[in-house]
Amino acid sequence: MLQITNLVKRYGSDEPVLKNLSLTVPERNVVSVIGASGAGKSTLLRCINRLVEPTSGDIELNGVNLTKLRGGQLRHARQRIGMIFQGFNLVERLTVMENVLSGRLGYVSFLRAAFRRFPQADIDRAFHFMERVGIAHYANKRADELSGGERQRVGVVRALMQEPEILLADEPTASLDPKTSEQIMALLRSLSEELSLPVLINIHNVTEAKAYTDRIVGMRYGRIIFDGAPTSLDEAAMDEIYAGTPVDDRAADQAAGRPLETVPS
């Protein structure tokens, strides 16, 4: 389970990008995060995997406080967080199998990684997941020869090879056509159920969020202002999520006496 409490991210002296944000994602739950550009959706995901350092607050994954980890402990924790990217983040000149096995780099020695001599168990696991998502027949094909949907499937398998405790997906369908987008969203949902994995998806397509996720979180300029079932996301909720400006929200925060961040005691 992912538990986020009073998360704040501030760049320099600017207004926080994330403002006292709290969120829980249980196992076997697919949660989508929607909101206008600049709402803080991508920053939230990057704080979870510590690609961006939180300013304050706590992020716990299965009882481990990720914000307190440093060095080797942080590297080990990152191995357990699978990340799926909008731009796929594949090494184009490498084969599908080589890209997939890169998900095991944190588990093998430097020499094994350098010479791509992965244990047979890793290779077997790679074939298992490639068959599951329908790309096993592309194992020896270069990544730059694949379609967008095929590349994203490679990205999904690479994340699964990390043996993750959670999957984070940052706009996983933004570069895909509508049919392929639906296939990828359906795949993420089924994998969550099969592997008892929590999945947190940053997504712009509200229709896909309503069709393929268990819960929708609506963000507006650093705050969560909607958190509920897809069926409860009505026009009024949509207007609240996508209306306004940062200036309007700052004025509303001041009028309501809402703090931008909690000062640790």
Predicted segments, located by residue:
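Helix N-cap at the start of a conserved alpha-helix in ABC-type nucleotide-binding domains
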Residues: P178-T180
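Catalytic Walker B motif of ABC-type/P-loop ATPase nucleotide-binding domains
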Residues: L167-D170
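Conserved catalytic motifs of ABC-family nucleotide-binding domains
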Residues: E163
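Helix-to-loop junction immediately C-terminal to a conserved catalytic motif
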Residues: N49
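ABC ATPase NBD coupling module
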Residues: L66-G82, R112-Q120, L233
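Conserved ABC ATPase "signature" region
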Residues: V64-N65, V108, R112-H137
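Conserved ABC ATPase signature
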Residues: R142-L146, E150
